[in-house]
Design a protein with these regions (language model features):
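Conserved nucleic-acid-binding Ia/Ib motif block in the N-terminal RecA-like helicase ATPase lobe
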Residues: 41, 96-164, 172-175, 218-219
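Walker A/P-loop NTP-binding motif
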Residues: 59-64, 80-97, 121-122
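Residue-level signature of catalytic and energy-coupling elements of molecular machines
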Residues: 43, 55, 70, 86, ...
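Post-DEXD/H (motif II) to motif III coupling segment of the RecA-like Helicase ATP-binding lobe
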Residues: 169-178, 182-225
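The conserved Walker
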Residues: 72-76
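Intrinsic-disorder-associated, low-complexity terminal segments enriched in Asp/Asn/His/Tyr and depleted
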Residues: 19-20, 24
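Short, low-complexity intrinsically disordered segments enriched in A/P/G/S/L with frequent Arg
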Residues: 14-18
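Conserved pre-motif I regulatory segment
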Residues: 26-71
Length: 225
């Protein structure tokens, strides 16, 4: 079946954030940000007392419900940048008894997906997080989805497999993250990414991070954010 039409989302919803700002380190202390005590305690337990620029720059527009586009390289702290506001919103909305995931995170590689899963779990262990990727038995991932998750993190190919098998339902997704979007293009995931995006409810908040902005990434930004 051809993909359903997807109207362009208003650019006013988007916030473009840099990964650096030269901020005063004292102002970057976690106590200066509108984070819950649960999150602050979890960060401090991990030895995180201050936020990186990308994390601070993403937080305000994200908590306002805006879509976020970030020019960010690997190693800038962007995983915590998108996960903090999403976790805060999920904590505010309370525990979900729904088994369907509320947040989907797309990564170009298994290694990055596993790294992001670890980061999210370390921040708030109570969040139900599942990482899915190819090359391993899909049955275990299907069982975990049936038990219920809040975050599903994975590579586009395996996510498509799970969608086609009816194991992954996206109709409850409230938050979508595309990480290292330019690398999605480099490894040939552009069709899978767009197919997944078209399955997600339009009433969602979207985060896109990319070190560079090739034409496809710009088009995805205009179409889905």
């Amino acid at each position: 079946a051809p993909p359903r039409p997807f109207p362009l989302r208003p650019a006013a919803r988007r916030a473009a954030v840099p990964d650096h700002s030269g901020s005063n380190p004292d102002k970057m202390h976690v106590d200066n940000f509108p984070l819950s005590e649960i999150t602050k305690a979890a960060l401090k337990k991990r030895g995180i007392d201050t936020l990186f620029d990308i994390q601070a720059n993403v937080l305000a527009p994200a908590l306002e419900g805006r879509d976020v586009v970030g020019r960010a390289r690997t190693g800038t702290g962007k995983t915590l940048g998108f996960s903090l506001p999403i976790i805060e919103s999920l904590l505010t909305s309370g525990d979900s008894r729904d088994a369907r995931p509320r947040c989907i995170v797309l990564a170009p590689t298994r290694e990055l997906a596993l790294q992001m899963e670890k980061e999210i779990e370390a921040t708030v262990p109570a969040m139900r997080t599942l990482c899915v990727y190819g090359g391993v038995a899909i049955a275990n991932q299907e069982r975990a989805l049936r038990r219920g998750v809040d975050f599903v993190v994975g590579t586009p190919g395996r996510l498509i497999d799970l969608i086609q098998r009816g194991s992954l339902q996206l109709d409850n997704i409230q938050y979508c993250v595309l990480d290292e979007a330019d690398q999605m293009l480099a490894v040939g995931f552009e069709e899978d990414v767009e197919r997944i995006m078209q399955e997600i409810p339009q009433q969602r908040q979207t985060f896109l991070f990319s070190a560079t902005m090739p034409a496809w990434v710009k088009r995805v930004t205009q179409k889905y954010l």
